[in-house]
Amino acid sequence: MPNSNGPLSNSGGKLQNDPRDRGTSPPQRAIADYDDGESVHLTLDPSVQDGRFHPRFSGLTGTVVGTQGDAFKVEVNDGGMDKTLIVGAAHLRTQRQEE
């Protein structure tokens, strides 16, 4: 039986930028501020290593429940179980609210 090649072996597509997005990401993303109770989307920014979450949670939507240092605590539901992730602002996007 072959080796697994590590815990991030099947996450290559999630950890690569599209050709148009390569290089330094916009600084506005890294300093964005989110309020408690705000809904946010989890999207990995491969250009920023700090504050990254495990790729298994990529694409989920969660709720900001607080801060820890410069990062945000985001609560997500993973298969019926609530989990709290510590995520940097560069990896979060605000969910658009319908008006």
UniProtKB/Swiss-Prot annotation:
One GO CC term, this protein: ribosome
Keyword annotations from UniProtKB, A to Z: Ribonucleoprotein, Ribosomal protein
Domain of life: Archaea
Gene3D superfamilies for the chain: Ribosomal protein L21
An MF annotation (GO) of this entry: structural constituent of ribosome
Region feature (Disordered): 1-38
Compositionally biased spans, kind Polar residues: 1-14
InterPro entries assigned: Ribosomal_eL21, Ribosomal_eL21_arc, Ribosomal_eL21_CS, Ribosomal_eL21_sf, Translation_prot_SH3-like_sf
Gene Ontology process terms (BP): translation
Family the entry assigns: Belongs to the eukaryotic ribosomal protein eL21 family.
Protein name, as recorded: Large ribosomal subunit protein eL21
Species per Swiss-Prot/TrEMBL record: Halobacterium salinarum (strain ATCC 700922 / JCM 11081 / NRC-1)
Lineage: Archaea, Methanobacteriati, Methanobacteriota, Stenosarchaea group, Halobacteria
